């Protein structure tokens, strides 16, 4: 349901027949059978009754979500933090990392995908203050990074892991 109470056709909004999105449940009691942070794969969409059927990733448990519950407590799960992605498998990953990213965090970011892992590496420009200002960042994009490191922990993240990077220009994605 949309916030206005109108029906939203999930299948059409996400692409007809596209039932492979994961969802996450938020802000509900920890003793509920469907737990906070569970990830689910949508297996069916019922647009007439405004509900979805889903299978929990990991153990295959099934549940149906509908109405206000679906609207208020379910979010798409294809954008998660690096830490939340640990132990998961995906088709591809895209991680936005800073020049202070640790080797361990980069390893987690660059290993969960079967096909490709891409890191978008940001670096502050000279003269910037401590406040984060996306318009003032340069964007660096790596190819397939190999999670092998020399021991230069003070060097930028792309040097520490031996990733191939090429500069795409200031504000290239903003």
From Swiss-Prot:
Listed name of the protein: Uncharacterized protein Mb2338
Superkingdom to which the source organism belongs: Bacteria
Lineage per the UniProt record: Bacteria, Bacillati, Actinomycetota, Actinomycetes, Mycobacteriales
Gene3D superfamilies in the record: P-loop containing nucleotide triphosphate hydrolases
InterPro entries: P-loop_NTPase
